[in-house]
Design a protein with these regions (language model features):
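Enriched for short, Lys/Arg-rich terminal
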Residues: 1-3, 12-16, 20-23, 53-56, ...
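Basic nucleic-acid-binding interfaces
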Residues: 5, 16, 40-43
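Hydrophobic, well-ordered secondary-structure scaffolds
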Residues: 5-6, 25-27
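Charged, well-structured alpha/beta interaction segments
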Residues: 7, 20-21, 33
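A short, surface-exposed loop/turn module that caps and links secondary-structure elements
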Residues: 27-52, 82
Length: 89
């Protein structure tokens, strides 16, 4: 089981969600603890990945040696979603 951490940015992003979006995103993030590279996860670069949760994207990093997943951002899909990924995590 991997330990989960959210950056302050990711926590703010999650706090802004509501209703079904919140439930689905939180469930997806919790699932990363059991399976950090679920089906459909896409490697962005380096240790950074993204998963799709409806219209939302969860950007995160996996550190296998430490069994750690750090969620850096939760955002609605747009051209800006993936900008500056390295600075997030």
């Amino acid at each position: 089981v991997y330990r989960l951490e959210l950056t302050p940015r990711a926590q703010r992003d999650v706090d802004k969600l509501g209703g079904d979006d919140l439930e689905r995103v939180v469930a997806a993030i919790r699932g990363l603890g059991e399976k950090p590279r679920p089906r459909g996860a896409k490697k962005i670069r380096g240790p950074h990945y993204r998963i799709r949760v409806g219209d939302w994207r969860v950007i995160y990093s996996v550190f296998d040696k430490d069994q750690l997943v750090i969620v850096g951002k939760v955002a609605r899909r747009s051209k800006r979603t993936y900008k500056r990924v390295n600075e997030l995590l």
